[in-house]
Amino acid sequence: ISTKATFPMGKDVNAYGSSRFHLIEACENSLRRLNTDHIDVYHMHGFDGSTPVEETLRALDDLVTSGKVRYIACSNFSGWHLMKSLSIAEKYGWSKYISHQVYYSLLNREFEWELMPLGIDQKIGTMVWSPLASGRLSGKYRRNSAIPEKSRIAAGTSTVPKDAAPEERLYAIVDVLDEISRETDKSVAQIALNWLLQRPTVSSIIVGARTE
């Protein structure tokens, strides 16, 4: 069981962020909504620059000590955000982030520049979100073809910006995936996902699904 905190859950000033007040309240609310007595991995959805890192980590360590949270993780941190958090946790003997959730795909590989080496060095696992680049690597997007009408990109709700990479780069990648697909009898999406699962530090990928 995994869930997140930090992003707004209401309009009140204490209904968002990574302050001690909000994290403890958010955890209790999540436990109630999930109808469970513990959270296996509790993610900070983003770095809260308005709250001292010490306050955030102490609150999370208290949640771990209480048994309500087993492990803590973070999401969308920069390299210095993550390294500062790990350093402070080590200094005080508090629980450390065991995993970092990031955007990473064959189309966008910036994760490899800094965060992957950091993960290797500090033994931090990686959970990848949008591994198919908001569907761009699903096999539905083809050179000289229209964007699928019901796609998130067409609707403007994609978590990966439309200009995340030049179109020619996308189609060049898809062309190669098509070749491998024919050779292996696997889908373009399967190949793109399998590539990610073989990458250093990647322990899990998050695949979205339609609700229809």
Identify the residue ranges that each predicted region occupies.
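A short, structured active-site edge motif that brings together acidic residues
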Residues: 1-9, 100-102
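Outer-envelope exported proteins of Gram-negative bacteria
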Residues: 2, 41-43, 74
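Short, small-residue-rich loop/turn micro-motifs
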Residues: 3-5, 38, 46, 130, ...
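Short, acidic/polar
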Residues: 17-35, 58, 82-87
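Active-site groove signature of glycoside hydrolases
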Residues: 31-52
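Beta/alpha (TIM)-barrel catalytic core signal, keyed to glycine-rich beta->alpha loops juxtaposed to Asp/Glu
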Residues: 51-212
